[in-house]
UniProtKB/Swiss-Prot annotation:
Keywords: Coiled coil. Residues 437-465 form a coiled coil. It comes from Invertebrate iridescent virus 6 (IIV-6). This is Uncharacterized protein 467R. It comes from the Viruses. Belongs to the IIV-6 467R family.
């Protein structure tokens, strides 16, 4: 044991003594002695432990390498720079190890990259991390997002970012994706879509952006996937895709308005958040909130909606239907996590992400003049956050805007006259079909054929009810829009109902 600290002995003998008799305390003592003594002998001893002594745990060797790097930073006249070289040896031996936590590995790789920026082995280490089958895709995505946000601080090149994103994009799985730590296939797809968003929004000129668009299009067109997933992918293409893919996304979103042979209206179709009127008014409302808050506060004084505050609000305003309490609480927390840690979309002229918008909304609510208004807005915030989970990024924005319907002049989400008439028309026709004695035959006419001659039962019903529907709609809207516009919107509604494209 005494041989460990007998620095007159040859290096080889001291290393053998450390491996045979040393422990964690021994290593820490050597590190302390290095700091105090500035001894090149101790420095060389620690370096050799990193380079040659695989019997010593990766954790201890990593600690030694980082200590050498810190020591060399403080040296006024370093005799030899070996700390980063020592770290390279440790990283090579630990990149397959399960002993070192994921976050510690990443930190070590980034430190190594900052000291040896031309070392290509760092790419190997990152690849192993991002393809580790025991780690959730969400965790891998958060890792890459961290690399994007910390590029300058850690000397991360755009090439490295592109490489990491391309690794995630190339690991696209079908429905056989293994469930890891309760991460379902739908969870995986949601994060994969956000990975595509990250590629297209932060670094739009990267080669992997082409892969991202193709993967999003593949998801959009997959009719075996849920409407929410397909709509989310379409939303990303509408925001970031090429002109051609944007057109494809619009067509797919239109088709998602017809689900299970039922026409979805503005009131029951999540994907209507992409209509121009709704999108414009939602952005207008959020812009009003941002500008009002900016008049009252500096950016650093904005109120932060933390997870603890959200939990307290959920408990304060539970859903009315008790069997749904747990699922609705889970929905609100999932929505919060996407807003805080995952989504990259930017909105308004201020280029705010959903996290910024949520905190501005929370600041506005907390500075409401009336207590009754604050209570109602808090309730609406929780209700909307329960509902926004599993919608696309635009859906989140619309839900935030909808909190303020009736509270702001020109606030909330405005439904266009054409969309209102479509909803009323749909409701009246659907009611007539439901009460008809030939209900099943009429529905078959609508669902199973495109031939007008095979829609006789539906056409017969329509001829009977149409005059009354038109008259009631004209009476309801005569004070708001012209008669010619009413006629146009009714024809459009009839065309949409029959499944035709109206031009």
């Amino acid at each position: 044991m005494d041989d460990i600290f007998n620095f007159e002995l040859p290096l080889h003998d001291r290393i053998k003594a450390i491996v045979k008799f040393g422990d964690e305390t021994t290593i820490k003592r050597l590190i302390s002695l290095l700091t105090i003594s500035n001894s090149s002998i101790i420095k060389n001893t620690l370096y050799h432990l990193c380079k040659f002594c695989s019997d010593i745990s990766c954790v201890l060797r990593l600690e030694i390498a980082l200590a050498l790097i810190d020591y060399e930073k403080e040296e006024t006249e370093p005799s030899e720079i070996i700390g980063f070289e020592a770290l390279d040896y440790v990283c090579f031996s630990m990149h397959k190890s399960k002993e070192i936590p994921f976050s510690c590995k990443l930190n070590a790789y980034l430190i190594l990259n900052s000291g040896l920026p031309n070392l290509k082995r760092v790419y190997l280490y990152l690849y192993d991390m991002l393809t580790d089958s025991s780690t959730t895709f969400q965790f891998k995505y958060k890792t890459v997002k961290f690399l994007v946000s910390e590029r300058e601080e850690n000397n991360i090149t755009s090439l490295m970012v592109e490489y990491c994103i391309s690794v995630l994009l190339s690991n696209f799985h079908d429905s056989s994706y293994p469930k890891i730590n309760n991460e379902t296939y739908e969870d995986y797809l949601q994060i994969f879509i956000l990975t595509c968003q990250l590629s297209l929004s932060y670094v739009p000129k990267l080669k992997c952006s082409c892969i991202a668009e193709n993967k999003l299009l593949e998801i959009c067109k997959n009719q075996n996937l849920s409407v929410n997933i397909r709509a989310d992918a379409s939303d990303m293409l509408l925001s970031y895709g090429s002109s051609e893919n944007k057109e494809e996304a619009k067509i797919i979103l239109d088709s998602l308005s017809f689900d299970n042979h039922t026409i979805k209206t503005i009131y029951n179709n999540k994907e209507n958040v992409h209509t121009s009127t709704i999108n414009k008014t939602a952005i207008n409302t959020i812009t009003i909130i941002i500008e009002d808050v900016n008049k009252m506060f500096q950016r650093e004084d904005i109120w932060i909606l933390t997870e603890n505050i959200l939990q307290n609000l959920i408990e304060k305003y539970p859903p009315n239907f008790k069997p749904q309490i747990k699922s609705q609480i889970d929905n609100a927390i999932k929505a919060y996590n996407r807003i805080m840690y995952l989504d990259n979309a930017l909105y308004t002229a201020y280029n705010f992400n959903l996290k910024n918008i949520m905190n501005y909304v929370w600041t506005f609510i907390n500075n409401s003049n009336k207590v009754s208004n604050k209570v109602e807005l808090e309730k609406r915030l929780i209700e909307e956050m329960r509902e926004m989970n599993n919608t696309c990024s635009s859906g989140y924005l619309t839900r935030f805007a909808n909190i303020f319907s009736g509270f702001l002049e020109n606030g909330g989400v405005f439904i266009g006259w054409d969309e209102q008439i479509l909803s009323i028309f749909y409701g009246k026709v659907n009611s007539a079909i439901t009460s008809s004695l030939n209900k099943d035959l009429i529905l078959e006419n609508l669902i199973e054929t495109e031939n007008e001659n095979d829609k006789q039962e539906f056409q017969k019903l329509l001829r009977t009810i149409l005059p009354n529907i038109i008259e009631s709609i004209k009476i309801e809207f005569k004070d708001h829009i012209s008669e010619s516009d009413i006629d146009l919107y009714i024809r459009r509604a009839l065309s949409v109902f029959e499944g035709h494209e109206f031009i």
